[in-house]
Structures are given as structure tokens and as C-alpha cells.
Regions:
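C-terminal extensions of enzymes
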Residues: 188-247
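Residue-level detector of functional hotspots within protein domains
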Residues: 11-14, 106, 133, 203, ...
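Glycine-centered secondary-structure boundary/capping sites
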Residues: 7, 95-96, 113, 143, ...
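Glycine-rich phosphate/ribose-binding loops and adjacent secondary-structure elements
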Residues: 16-187
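Short, exposed beta-strand "edge-strand" segments with a Pro/Gly-rich flavor and a Y/T-containing core
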Residues: 4, 16-23, 214-220
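Short glycine/proline- and acidic residue-enriched helix-loop micro-motifs
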Residues: 11-18, 189-193
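ATP-dependent carboxylate/acyl-activation modules
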Residues: 1-13
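Compositionally biased, intrinsically disordered low-complexity regions
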Residues: 9, 180-184, 197, 244
Length: 247
């Protein structure tokens, strides 16, 4: 079904895809410009999503210098992020932790006095161990303007895949719970209303917990970049992220 939509029948589609024809930041910006123009006359923002890697900071720096300032956000996805359409070897062994690359991007913007010009969003493993609010708080203190969730929301819809037993049927069209499929025999298995309510309840709980974490540091708004609110017992982590070391 996806092959037909993209006009490439009987072709293996890899995830994440490579963007053939884009070899420079200038070409990427041009693609964003064309996408923005196509998206209802520049009324819809277009953001960049980048895997956390050695080149993340370079990409972000180039976007900061874009004279047209058309990038609506920079999404960094860490190694703990997941997609059911990827090979397990890619899921387990490629990418960097989002924490360090997020911090590098934020500090790069600070050094240029451009923090906040392009909002930073962090994801990849947020809430994976049941601590979404705490994870979000740490990311925001390290410089993120917000976080994004993926796998955990799909699980709230009823996805049966998890870290202990991956389903990995997302790209096959045979999703057993009816989420990632167009097959009418499977779609009916998804209870949309119940799944939506699960997500609403989860996000409201996350919001409440995040407010409780912000209260002790005296913030009523998101503490973007307030690394002084964080400490670590690992000296290497303290040195890398520029936060306080305690023992």
C-alpha cells in the first residue's frame, strides 16, 4: 500500500530512508522552502528531524545561519527511539544518546546568541521506563523547548510491541491490533475512542507530574536551559553536559 502511494511498487523501502539528491544544507533548506510554499502558502511550519549523531550540531548550526529563517523546529531523535519499520540491528546499534547531542546543539546556539531562534525538540526513549515527566524535565533543563513521544503513544493505542518482544509488523500492513494497516479485516480491531482516551489521560498525568517537578525550582513556565537545576553523580556526565557533579 505504501509502495503504491509513493509510486515505487515492488521496491523495498528502508527506514529510516535516505534522501537521494540532498547533499548539502542549502539543498535541504531549498526543499523546506518548496514544502512551505506547497503547504498552504507558508501558513504551516516545516521542521527538520535528525537522528542524534556526530553531525547533528553541524546541521543545526547551518540551519541557525539560514538567512530566510524558515525552519520551524529541530527534532533530535536518540538511539533509544524506535520505529516498527526499522531493522532490529539499526534500532539497537545506530545513533547517539539524545542527551549529549541536545546539549551540544543548545550550547552552540547560546554561543551565537541564537538560542530559541529554532526550537529544539528531544525524543528517543522518553518515558520508556515509566518516567516520562522526569525525562522531559531533564531534557528541557538541558536546552530542549519540548519533547516528543512516539512508541509509548502507540502502545497506549494497543500496540503489542515492546522492548522485550518487538512485533515489527508496522511496515507489513498486517498489524495485529489494527493500528498500522489499511486492511479492513484488521482495522476494526482498533478501538479509536478508547485509545484516544488513554492518550489524553496519560498526557494529563504527565502534565501534572511535570508541574510538580518544576515547583521546587520556582518555575511556572518551562525551565529551558536551566542546567543548574540538574546534578549527577557521574563526573564524565557532568563534564560532558556542563552540569553540577555531586558525590
Amino acid at each position: 500500500h505504501i509502495q503504491a502511494i509513493r509510486g515505487v511498487p515492488r521496491t523495498t523501502l528502508h527506514s529510516p530512508p535516505n534522501h537521494q539528491g540532498l547533499y548539502s544544507i542549502e539543498e535541504s533548506v531549498q526543499k523546506m522552502h518548496l514544502s512551505l510554499n506547497a503547504a498552504f502558502g507558508f501558513r504551516v511550519p516545516v521542521a527538520i528531524k535528525c537522528a542524534a549523531s556526530a553531525t547533528s550540531v553541524s546541521v543545526y548550526n547551518n540551519l541557525l545561519r539560514d538567512p530566510y529563517k524558515i525552519c520551524g523546529g529541530f527534532f533530535i531523535d536518540g538511539i533509544q527511539g524506535g520505529t516498527g519499520a526499522a531493522n532490529e540491528v539499526s534500532l539497537d546499534h545506530t545513533g547517539h544518546p539524545v542527551v549529549s547531542k541536545l546539549r551540544d546543539c543548545y550550547l552552540a546556539a547560546v554561543r551565537q546568541g541564537l538560542q530559541g531562534q529554532i526550537p529544539l525538540w528531544a525524543g528517543g526513549g522518553i518515558g520508556m521506563t515509566g518516567t516520562a515527566a522526569a525525562d522531559a524535565f531533564k531534557m528541557i533543563c538541558l536546552g530542549a523547548n519540548g519533547v516528543f513521544l512516539g512508541k509509548i503513544l502507540i502502545q497506549l493505542l494497543g500496540c503489542v510491541g515492546n522492548e522485550q518482544g518487538r512485533c515489527n509488523a508496522c511496515s507489513t500492513g498486517r498489524c495485529p491490533t489494527g493500528i498500522c494497516t489499511q486492511d479492513p479485516r484488521l482495522v476494526h480491531r482498533l478501538d479509536v475512542d478508547r485509545g484516544a482516551q488513554n492518550i489524553v489521560d496519560y498526557m494529563l498525568a504527565l502534565d501534572g507530574e511535570l508541574r510538580k517537578l518544576m515547583a521546587p525550582i520556582g518555575n511556572s513556565s518551562l525551565p529551558v536551559g536551566r542546567s543548574d537545576a540538574l546534578v549527577t553523580t557521574d563526573r564524565a556526565v557532568a563534564d560532558k553536559l556542563g552540569i553540577q557533579y555531586v558525590c
